[in-house]
Amino acid sequence: MDSKYNPVSIEQKWQKNWAEQNQDQTPINNNQPKFYALSMFPYPSGNLHMGHVRNYTITDVIARLKRMQGYRVLHPMGWDAFGLPAENAAIDRGIPPAKWTLENIAQMKEQLRRLGFSIDWDKEVATCTPEYYRWTQWIFLQFFQAGLAYQKESAVNWDPIDQTVLANEQVDGEGRSWRSGAKVERKMLRQWFFKITDYAEQLLNDLDKLPGWPERVKLMQANWIGKSVGAYLEFPIVGMDQKIGVFTTRPDTVYGVSYVVLAPEHPLTAKVTTPEQQITVETFIKEVAAESELERTAEDKPKRGVPTGGKAINPFNNQEVPIWIADYVLYEYGTGAVMGVPAHDVRDFQFAKQYNLPIKTVIVPDDSNDDHKLTEAYTDVGVMVNSGPFNGEKSTVAKKAIIELAEDEGYGKGRVQYRLRDWLISRQRYWGAPIPIIHCPKCGAVPVPDEDLPVKLPESVEFSGRGPSPLAKLEDWVNVSCPSCGTPAKRETDTMDTFIDSSWYYLRYPDATNEEQVFDSKIVNDWLPVDQYVGGIEHAILHLLYSRFFTKVLRDRGLCDFDEPFQNLLTQGMVQGVTYKNPVTGKYIPFADVNPQEPKDPKTGDKLEVFFEKMSKSKYNGVDPMDVMATYGADTARMFILFKAPPEKDLEWDDADVQGQFRFLNRVWSMVMEFLANHSFSELKAKHHGITQADLKDLGWSRYLITEITKNISAFKLRNVVKVYPVEDVLVAIEAKFNYSETQQETKDDLQKVLTWIKSRFGGELTKAEKDVRRAVHNAIKEVTEDLDGDYQFNTAVSEMMKLSNALGDASCKDSPIYAEALETLLLLLAPFAPHITEELWQIAGNFGSVHTHAWPKFDPEALVVDEITLVIQIKGKTRGTIQVPAQADKETLEKLARESDIAQRHLAGKEIKKVIVVPRKLVNFVVI
């Protein structure tokens, strides 16, 4: 038995043991309450970073806690394994994406094991495997059959040199291709969409069903969905039998329309453009095509536009207004057209001033008919002017009347619109789930039959980063027969957005090896919704929104019976590292090259800026988790991550605090080992449990009772129990636990004899030192449990355990079984946080079974009751000393005890007491003359 704490060897030992025992296997439904603890699964980049460590440590503590609290726990892990980096590796290094990905998974899985996470690896999924994406494809077909998957033209990022589609992350800040350097263009392609807008209202309303989510996340989702109530209005085009449809939240301003704007990509743009304006319009469209969506909609960027020469009619006043195109109007958003009301919209006002367009006031703050020249847009409500039959009305009233007029006259109708757009899921990439559609010249888009799933990714693929998608180049793979009519047809060559893979993985985990169906609904309905989901705030919108959408669609398809996938959400903060930056050159300097006491650039001597930022390779401020574990062990890394900051706040890395947690674990190790050094295991058991199996056999009690008591002897700690509670109370408690029936009267009688014998042998009051220790223990149980069962304030829970260790270090009853119980309780409280050291000490102390399968300690309020308190004695307000008095003593008793004390006798001798002030439980002050 090594007396020195050696974390690396201990951790390796127990990780091997837990794996061999399959200790973290998910239990079957055994009538225990369930708890589904889930971290957002990682992309297999090959190495864990500290952000991963924080995320998964938080979830692991919760999972371990819930097991100890009597829950059956599902704590799985998998890999969000499709994505662009694997394809880039194939292009740059000639490594097949599958090989690169699977090697990274193997490496990261080993790193996760080294951190001691209690993951059920039998539930592992990887989204890039045919076994998984077969069901991703099947789910796509469920959407297709429900009318929720469709194709339409949409803009993509196009590299004109490499002749290929680029993902947003492949376009730099200047709008250039990451590989060729070409200015990226916008190009229209026919692509697949999911009709998430059909669920917009549900997605918005059901946020109210998520009280366990952070309010800011719900607000972000609500804003992203962006519900707007207004009107759809149509403006006839002069000289054409077509109309321009617009949506507005301010139909009360329609009489102030002075122009209409189309998106450059709008199908009507070419039709309304006059010959005189054709070159101007085409040139402008080409310029806009080179801009990203972010560039076009940036608020700090001047809005640009050109007139088409066409005109539209405002149906409310029959006035002709010019039709423009502008960069800030996007075809994919709303109707792809807006009505310009410069007097009452900030953006329209700026645009009108820039291009000298009319500005017509139709709402004023009062009924003064004030039509003065505006210096800025008036966007508030007010009184209608210059608005025909609505003049003089409140704009809030006129809004409804104008919608009714539009509906009566056929100009439009009331409408609810959402900022949320349908989800573009097509990707012109190889490393993703193939879309299971075959395009037939006769039948159109035909779903691949279920029996032909999965549509597997071909392995012999050339990756150049140029030209069409790699799949589109494989004629043998592309050319197939139509499943419906047998005509020569072609496979869909787009793959799915990787967000689709992560939108349903949490549903696969409970039934991860099912080969017959996407999942067994009975199993999924048992485990879902996820009880605690943990992940970064960066996923607050897309991933979480898409997962909610998927759950609702699959519910409507009869596959599950719950509305929301994640009952509680914890968004952990970032892990930040100390960052050094040269303000002169703008370069980041590796922290290893800097003297923290005098931070200067080692090359130039410039004084460096010092601040904390999210850890990243580019800023040279990252800390490798493997290095920390090699030096201090996984338990220390976990403890630091949990202690340094509340989970929802950003965490600043601090080597000194890492060392502080290492010292704390060393202290716990030393305390237990010192106790064991002075007590043999047999003596410890006799003292700690107070009764042995030999004692029971000698007294000839029933075999059933012997079995039950010895099996649960550690849980009862009978000696300590009967020192604190009456035998009758203990008897009732044990009867309740074993649920004895009336037919077991003999057993109950024997049990009473056992307890009476223990009382006679080990009875007696606890000493003051023992009471103090017991009070410290149960205060820690109370505080740690509340910290973990509430908002998961791990940092304060660790602080409470450190307080308990300090109290035990100062205790004067280290030979007492109460002290032994206290050490055991400390290990139990610490177990979810530092699983390896607690398991080792638990076993060394002679306990049976794993510390992680032991019941969580229960708080006893009686233990906090104080028998005596310290009473301060003052003379004329000056403290002269303290005495111990009964905690429940009344004022008269306190005064009496204070008067009789040696302190009072000494300081009051020969003095007249004018007044006595008694503050219960605090002090007695003698006012003397």
From Swiss-Prot:
Gene Ontology biological process terms, A to Z: leucyl-tRNA aminoacylation
Primary localisation category: cytoplasm
Gene3D superfamilies: 3.10.20.590, HUPs, Isoleucyl-tRNA Synthetase, Domain 1
Protein EC: 6.1.1.4
Cellular component, GO, one term: cytosol
Database matches in PROSITE patterns: AA_TRNA_LIGASE_I
A molecular function GO annotation: ATP binding
Localization (cell): Cytoplasm
Record InterPro entries: aa-tRNA-synth_I_CS, aa-tRNA-synth_Ia, Leu-tRNA-ligase, Leu_tRNA-synth_edit, M/V/L/I-tRNA-synth_anticd-bd, Methionyl/Leucyl_tRNA_Synth, Rossmann-like_a/b/a_fold, tRNAsynth_Ia_anticodon-bd
Motif position, 'KMSKS' region: 614-618
Sites where the protein binds ATP: 617
Key word Transcription present: no
Positions occupied by motif 'HIGH' region: 42-52
Catalysed conversion reaction: tRNA(Leu) + L-leucine + ATP = L-leucyl-tRNA(Leu) + AMP + diphosphate
Keyword vocabulary terms for this entry: Aminoacyl-tRNA synthetase, ATP-binding, Cytoplasm, Ligase, Nucleotide-binding, Protein biosynthesis
Pfam families documented for this protein: Anticodon_1, tRNA-synt_1, tRNA-synt_1_2, tRNA-synt_1g
PANTHER family from the UniProt entry: LEUCINE--TRNA LIGASE, MITOCHONDRIAL, LEUCYL-TRNA SYNTHETASE
Family of this protein: Belongs to the class-I aminoacyl-tRNA synthetase family.
Full protein name: Leucine--tRNA ligase
Provenance organism: Trichodesmium erythraeum (strain IMS101)
Gene: leuS
